[in-house]
């Protein structure tokens, strides 16, 4: 329906981290291929016309529905270059139940240049960093057998979801450097 985004985790090949805090190699690794996966939902801003400072903790608040008792959510905020490379700036991971959720992300600090964009990537796994959640509500997902693994479809409400960014334009003019 309008105003909702859906995406599905297929059990046999869960999404991985693609750099960032949880990935190997860690740090600023281009994750554009990870973002292009069918089990990764992305939201990309328009290009910035002026420099912007992003400094502090990032937080995702979202309304997510699913028929499963639990699911995992890996949220990554990336800086996207004019050439399309996506470098992680902040990320968070949580095991959640359907409904209104909050995913705190690590703090970051960078200046976004004109022509660059921000991208939020959401995936229902971050394997092998975290065990794949079977969707059964089990407290210890690694104890579930392969037969217990479910295909999980998530539905995000755009109207009830927000990404909180500590961002402001960079001052320019006489006396400003």
Where are the model-predicted features located?
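Glycine/threonine-rich phosphate-binding loop and adjacent beta-strand/alpha-helix elements that clamp
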Residues: 1-177
């Amino acid at each position: 329906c309008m105003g909702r985004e859906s995406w599905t985790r297929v059990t046999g090949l869960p999404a991985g981290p693609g750099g960032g805090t949880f990935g190997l190699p860690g740090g600023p690794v281009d994750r554009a291929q990870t973002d292009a996966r069918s089990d990764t939902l992305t939201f990309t801003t328009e290009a910035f016309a002026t420099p912007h400072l992003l400094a502090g903790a990032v937080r995702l608040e979202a309304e997510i529905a699913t028929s499963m008792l639990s699911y995992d959510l890996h949220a990554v905020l990336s800086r996207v270059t004019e050439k399309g490379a996506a470098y992680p700036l902040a990320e968070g991971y949580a095991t959640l139940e359907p409904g209104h959720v909050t995913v705190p992300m690590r703090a970051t600090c960078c200046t976004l240049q004109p022509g660059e964009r921000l991208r939020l990537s959401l995936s229902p796994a971050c394997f092998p960093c975290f065990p794949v959640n079977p969707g059964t509500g089990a407290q210890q997902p690694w104890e579930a057998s392969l037969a217990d693994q479910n295909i999980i479809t998530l539905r995000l409400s755009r109207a009830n979801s927000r990404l909180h960014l500590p961002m402001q334009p960079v001052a320019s003019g006489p006396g400003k450097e």
